[in-house]
Amino acid sequence: MLITTLLTLAFGQDTLPVYSGRGNQLSVAIPRLEAQAAVDGRLDESAWSRAARLTDFSQFQPVDGRAAEEATEVLVWYAPDAIWFGIRARENHGNVVRATRANRDNIASEDHVQILLDTNNDRRLAFLFGVNALGVQQDGTRSDQFGGGAGGQSATGGGTGNINPLDGTVDLNPDYVFESRGRLVDGGYEVEIRIPFKSLRYQEAEVQNWGIHVLRRVQHSGYQDTWAPAVRANASFLGQSGTLTGLRELRRGLVLELTPTAVARLDGSPETPEGWDYASDGELSGDVRWGIRQNLTLNGTVNPDFSQVEADVGQVLLNERFSLFYPEKRPFFLDGLELFDTPNQLIYTRRIVAPEGGVKLAGKVASTNIATLLAFDGKDQSWTGDHHPFFGVMRLRRDLGQNSTLGGVLTTREDGGDYSRLAGADLRLYHSRLYYVELQAVQSWTDSAGVSRSNPYLSATWDRTGRQWGFNYGVRAVEDGFNDAAGFVNRTGVIDAHIFN
């Protein structure tokens, strides 16, 4: 009986689906289980014994292509309403794992793992879910496309948890709902993650394939490892992802969030010797978020209250020629913000200072990203003091081939009888994994105090990302008078070029 049991256990362990990254087994048939597990950092429930196992990581930095020094194993399965990940990260150098109860997103200087889910399987944009050894969360998006976000994200991802600042844009401003818990164990750490499907936008196909990249940061050595072997001699990091195959019968449920807010204030002052004089004031506001479909989300807001939003980090203005640049942190604007991204930051939502009301639709239909935003700004910036500007923004981007895109953008800011309008197109073409070319042509039309003008903005970039050598050549021409009132173009009347080798 004992021998039979041992043989059964050994046979069961051997037949677990194992996918070796270094063995190029990058197509993962993810198991669908009618099960749940407690998110406690302990991978001891029966569901984990039936999960797919991602093993044999490769080093990405400092030397890509080598076998990872520290072993990492990622378990993955999904239930009807969520996808689950279990992480076993081994450490062979003793008690050197760095893990603290850091603030959300601030785990870049600690041992951590990032899971990138490309739910549209287009190798262009992925949801980012990161955790340190204690389960402290990091989340956002990662894109190979552009170097600047609509909410003020820089090409290096703002320096908060960016795995490699040379590979696309990491935006950690969005926050998603997911569960995680981790713990230190002998020889490393373990983390358990549950991501509900209602936190994601994904395709409408009955059977789906999702792109997946898993990255591990080993803090004491500075090494960065990936499950799918990734080389830096490639113009697309997400293009080197693996694939989760066969996801079906996903239950997202009703995605409807209502956030009513009431704010009251009572002021008192000793106006007379007999007593105080009191005055009161109050405001009502509300937000709604509706997941119309798996791939489309509608947001609305009326008189939004941003008093609980994290304050901006102070900046010192030394050169008055350029405006200060702040990231977007307001919840209404953050949801789906990555779909508004353009080259050269033609959309910058911080231009809408104090919205009185707004509506936004964002998502992906077939091979086209769609993002629209309409809002009234309560912050009057006119000379007369009686105008509330209206903002309208539309961004479309169509997938071409494996990684290339063709996009268009329309923006307008209407302020009384004045206006600032813009239309543009951009093209990004990849070739032979090493090269990409990015072209953009934009025209602005402005009418202010009865004076009309029309001015162009043109830019071009040619890039090669290679192991031995690479380059990035670019030129930009912005005519004097070009005006993008809904974007962040901090200097006009210039022609400049850059050469990096």
PLM region descriptions:
Residues 284-291, 357-363, 388-400, 421-437, ...:
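Feature captures outer-membrane beta-barrel proteins of Gram-negative bacteria and organelles
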Residues 297, 303, 311-312, 417, ...:
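Extended, well-ordered alpha-helical scaffold/bundle regions in very large, multi-domain proteins
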Residues 306-351, 439-440, 447-500:
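Extracellular/periplasmic loop regions
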